[in-house]
A protein has these predicted regions:
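Loop/turn elements at helix/coil->beta-strand transitions in domains of secreted/extracellular proteins
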Residues: 80-83, 260-263, 291-294, 329-334, ...
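Conserved SGNH/GDSL esterase-like catalytic core that processes O-acyl groups on lipids
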Residues: 93-205, 213-316, 407
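Alpha-helical scaffolding within the catalytic cores
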Residues: 59-72, 277-287, 319-321
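Active-site-proximal beta-strand/loop segments in catalytic clefts of secreted hydrolases
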Residues: 87-90, 266-270, 297-302, 337-341, ...
Length: 432
């Protein structure tokens, strides 16, 4: 990391200690990175380590420089909030890749403990929930997803929603189910959603008979709960006070506190494509709650499945999505992740399902490079780093890819996350 020049004296001793603390954590991160690099490359020689970098392809480096300047400012002053948003499909919904990066980047926060960011209770929608937070629920809920044309709910930035009219409806979330240290907590909860009638209200249960009422913002369509002490779990009940039940819809939960540092948000929906997110009416409105400083775009694996995949249409769809981000965060830095190498499923009548190499990965990689150049962003070329066309077979043989040759195993996602963090850290270290 860049050292502070001699003669720079911070106004308070605490700031000096802060810098030393953050520098120690960053040094630790680099040491762990070196260890991982040695172990991973020895075991998996098919990984093109020389290509593991964030390649800046734009003409104007201002977005990139301003983002890294914000990290520098936080490191030296201990002030400021930096929001990173990682958006994609099933690779991100599983939250192994993204949570690996989240935890590695969290090491840069030093003594500070900013919040976990936005999340969705996937378990309530009866789909796979990340294992790093636990969700349980009561009552009947119906789900809506951005991959479906027929939806009961109006969707926002998460691309998901759950709705209920049940009088016993309840959602419980534990942020640190496997972490004895209890890293993640919040002092402010923003529930994204809406009610069809004033007499249905989400309440935060604090004890056996204690409930916290929210502050409702009709413009942002959020319910905000202010807590007096940090919490690492929540229990939401849907209160029905009318003689008949009314529908309530939840589209996301934003966990916040006032700690400075880097917050790593992740949004993913199984099967989602770029048009899936474009179809969410409240996407831009909800994005204002995050206002990302950097966005990691990892949408594309589903767009490239059809044999008639059009690179031009893919770029045009992305242009439309990126314009939404520019409206909300004009100085946001974009990082594009190329699709992993993959196979597509071929169904044959009266025959077993088989898989066929999807050569569209090459076209998608070209499209991501063009997007990075056009929008002054960087490319993290996962397709090439993992070995290029048909390399997914080697990943499967090594226990890093599932049999469908699309999704990774836990070990594979963790490796991808570590590779990404390594490229991110190297890009930051060599920014000058």
């Amino acid at each position: 990391m860049r050292e502070i020049k001699s003669g720079v004296v911070l106004s308070k001793m605490r700031k000096i200690l802060l810098f030393l603390g953050v520098f120690f954590y960053v040094s630790q991160a680099i040491a762990v990175q070196d260890s991982l690099e040695t172990e991973d490359r020895k075991t998996f020689e098919f990984i093109a380590d020389s290509l593991n970098e964030m390649i800046f392809l734009g003409n104007n480096p201002d977005f990139r420089c301003k983002f890294y300047d914000k990290i520098d400012s936080f490191r030296t002053t201990g002030k400021g909030r930096i929001n990173i948003l990682h958006i994609g499909g099933s690779h991100v919904q599983a939250d192994i890749f993204s949570h690996t990066v989240r935890c590695r980047i969290d090491s840069l926060n030093g003594e500070f403990k900013p919040s976990r960011g936005i999340l969705f209770p996937y378990q309530v929608a009866k789909t796979n929930n990340p294992t790093n937070y636990k969700v349980t629920y009561a009552g009947e809920w119906k789900s809506s997803r951005n991959i479906k044309k027929d939806r009961e709910a109006i969707l926002g930035v998460t691309g998901m929603a759950v709705s209920t009219m049940d009088t016993i409806a309840e959602i419980r979330i534990k942020l640190n189910p496997k972490d004895s240290v209890g890293r993640w907590s919040f002092t402010r909860l923003k529930l994204l959603g809406y009610a069809e009638h004033p007499k249905v209200m989400p309440l935060l249960k604090l004890g056996n008979s204690s409930f916290l009422h929210p502050i409702y913002d009709s413009v942002a369509s959020t319910y905000t709960y202010i807590l007096s002490v940090p919490m690492d779990s929540l229990n939401l009940i849907i209160s029905q006070t009318d003689t008949i039940s009314h529908r309530f819809t939840l589209t996301g939960l934003l966990l916040e506190n006032d700690e400075p540092g880097i917050v790593y948000h992740s949004i993913g929906v199984n099967g989602a494509s770029v048009p899936s997110y474009l179809s969410c009416p409240n996407f831009e409105r909800d994005l204002n709650l995050i206002r990302p400083d950097m966005v990691i775009f990892a949408i594309g694996i589903n767009d490239a499945v059809p044999q008639n995949f059009s690179k031009n249409n893919f770029i045009a769809n992305y242009d439309s999505l990126l314009s939404k981000f520019r409206k909300v965060s004009p100085e946001c830095f974009f990082v594009f992740v190329s699709n992993n190498d993959s196979y597509r499923k071929i169904k044959r009548r009266y025959r077993r399902t088989r898989y066929q190499l999807n050569t569209n990965g090459v076209l998608a990689r070209e499209a991501f490079a063009m997007l990075a150049e056009k929008h002054d962003g960087s490319l993290w070329d996962l397709f090439s780093i993992m070995g290029g066309l048909d390399s997914i077979k080697k990943w499967e043989e090594s226990g890093l890819s599932q049999k469908d040759k699309v999704h990774f195993t836990k070990a594979g996602y963790t490796l991808v996350g570590n590779l990404f963090f390594e490229a991110f850290l190297n890009s930051y270290n060599n920014k000058d």
